[in-house]
Each structure stands twice: as structure tokens, then as C-alpha cells.
Amino acid sequence: MPEFRIEVAHDIAGCAATVALQEDTWSGDVVVPPQLMLAVVHNGGFVALGYAPDNPKPAGFVFGFLGIHDYHFRHHSHMLAVRDPYRGSGLAQQLKEAQRDHCLDQGIEIVAWTMDPLEARNARFNFGKLGAYTRTYHRDFYGAMPDKLNQGLPSDRIYVEWPIGHERTYKRLRGEDQPAPLEDAESEGIAYLLRADGDRPGGLAETTSASHLLVEIPRAFQELKARDPKLALQWRLAGRDAFERAFGEGYAAVEFLRAADGRGAYLLVPQPRRDLTLDTDEQ
């Protein structure tokens, strides 16, 4: 694993260094201008870049800004990107930890962001590595998006919340308290609200009265979308129905569980009052 150097951007050069990586990851149509990034940085926001040894180009970056949610300050992490050769290297976690340190210094308790709920790799990182959770679903949040990751489908998102000072977060970042395999949840009889039927999404279960629920998603959504856009849309709509129903009935997704054969599913539990941070130590 390469040792990355994390540099916090304080000037226009640092912010401008993110542009090529933004274009490679999404497209030139969705680039955040470095001038705007710099203004955000000088008003409580955060930009950090990760560099691999002997490579002057950034291997990844993270960008976020201050916001208010439910009358409390929090940090919104708008972008996180890592170049292909460095994905799975630990750089994404290093960038998130740098962002976390910045926010803790500001007295911020929650870092939040949106993510596509059907992206299994991102789910494993956000829920498994970081210890985040979600209880909010947004239909077509960004509208039609022209970039290569999102074009052709409604831009549905879950709103991910990361309690950066929570003991569970510390444990996850240290590699402790890792989620159990999906097979364990299945052997315990935890019910699926949504389960795959081959490559296709099955129908929703009739009841959500269980104490725990599973919502399965495709193993590799981008590959599925490239192969069969109509099937990808079926998954988008099925996932939408499952999450909206579960969240509407008081559940929150607190884990992403993986099986040895590559299957993956969110674990949902009943959530406490809306104004409380979820305590998921028991999961």
C-alpha cells in the first residue's frame, strides 16, 4: 500500500489541482470551479488532496463546506474522488479522516453527504469503513445529470450522516467492530424487504414489522447499467420503493453487509427520535 501525502488546500493552486480529477471522475459539465472552492475554504470549508510518492498529480481529493441541518451546524462533504489505480488503497479513508479532523477542530459533530444507494462499493466504504448511517431518501435529487456515472437514470440519493465523534466511528476507522457477513444475518432469519431474483429486483415484502430488515442492491451497478439500462432503471425504482417505505415507517440503514459470493445488502433497524444520533454499537 503506498504512503500518501495529504495536503490541505489554502490557495487557488491547491483548489485548481482538483479540476482534472473532477473531469476524469465525472465530466467537465459538473466541475466545481476552483475560485468557488477557494471562497468556500476561506469561509469554513475544506479541500484536501492526496498524493502518491513520485507522482505530481493528485491521486484523490475531498471537498466540503459548512451547512445547517435541523438548526445545527454540520459539514456537507460534496465531493470525494480517487483515481482508478489508487481505489481500494486506503486513500479515501485518509482523506475522510483529514476532513473529520478539520470538522472536529471546528466543533462540528456530523459530516453528511449524498450517495447513490445502488453503488455497492461506496456503500461498503461509507457504512463499513466509516460507520455512517442514513434515514433519508431523495428522489432524483440533482435532476438529469450528464456525467458518465449518472447519465440516463434518475439521480436518486440517500443522505448519509457520519457522527465523527462517536465511539463507533473511532472503532471503524481503526478497523475494529467490523460488520458481520451477510450470511450471518440470513442465518438469523432477518427478513428481506427487497431481494434480488437473479439479476432482477424481486418484489417488496408485504410487511415491515420486523426489528431488522435487509435491502439488497446489485453487486456492480455501473456494469449492470452499461449492459442493460432498462434493468438498471428497474433496480432504481425498486430501491426507491424499498427505502422510501422503510424510512417512512421509522427504519434507518446502519450497515452494509457482504456475502462471500459478492452479494450485498443494507441492514435497517428502527431509528430513535429524529433529533437523536443513532446508537448502533449493538449492530
Q: Model segments located where?
A:
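A conserved beta-strand-loop-helix scaffold within acyl/acetyltransferase catalytic domains
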Residues: F4-D84, L257-A259
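A short helix-loop-beta-strand connector motif used in the catalytic cores of GNAT acetyltransferases and
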Residues: L38-L49, L153-S155, G248-V254, G262-Y266
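Conserved acetyl-CoA pyrophosphate-binding loop and the N-cap/start of the following alpha-helix
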Residues: Y86, G90-A98
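Conserved GNAT acetyl-CoA-binding A-motif
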Residues: C103-D116
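Conserved catalytic-core motifs of GNAT/GCN5-like acyltransferases
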Residues: T114, R124, G131-N150, E255-R258
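C-terminal "cap" of GNAT-fold acetyltransferases
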Residues: F141-L173, L268-L278
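A conserved mid-domain beta-alpha-beta active-site/ligand-binding segment of alpha/beta enzyme cores
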Residues: W162-A226
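Charged, low-complexity intrinsically disordered regulatory/assembly segments
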Residues: D199-Q283
